[in-house]
Amino acid sequence: MAGTVVLRCCTSVTKVRTWKRCSKQIKEQRARLYIIWKCAVFLLSSHD
């Protein structure tokens, strides 16, 4: 019984680590897209 509890605990910790890694990558990707978007808007609006 104790073995299953430890196994479940380790499995949930692995899932949390994977989620944190994925979440970090998503945030970085959103930041890149935001910067690209702002540059595009700036270039289009400054076109006189």
UniProtKB/Swiss-Prot annotation:
Q: Mind telling me which GO cellular component terms the entry cites?
A: plasma membrane
Statement: the UniProt record of this protein carries the keyword Oxidoreductase:
no
Q: Tell me which InterPro entries the record gives.
A: DVL (IPR012552), DVL/RTFL_small_peptides (IPR052153)
Q: Which domain of life is it from?
A: Eukaryota
| GO terms for biological process, alphabetical | negative regulation of cell population proliferation; shoot system development
UniProt subcellular location: Cell membrane
Q: Which residue stretches, if any, does this entry annotate as coiled coil?
A: none
Keywords of the record, alphabetical order, are: Cell membrane, Developmental protein, Membrane, Transmembrane, Transmembrane helix
The segment annotated Required for DVL/RTFL small polypeptide activity runs over: 17-48
Enumerate the transmembrane spans.
4-23
Pfam families membership: DVL
Q: Which cysteines are joined by disulfide bonds?
A: none
Q: How does it sit in the membrane?
A: Single-pass membrane protein
Similarity remark: Belongs to the DVL/RTFL small polypeptides family.
- What is its biological role? Small polypeptide acting as a regulatory molecule which coordinates cellular responses required for differentiation, growth and development, probably by restricting polar cell proliferation in lateral organs and coordinating socket cell recruitment and differentiation at trichome sites.
Protein name (Swiss-Prot/TrEMBL): Small polypeptide DEVIL 14
Q: Could you tell me which species this protein originates from?
A: Arabidopsis thaliana
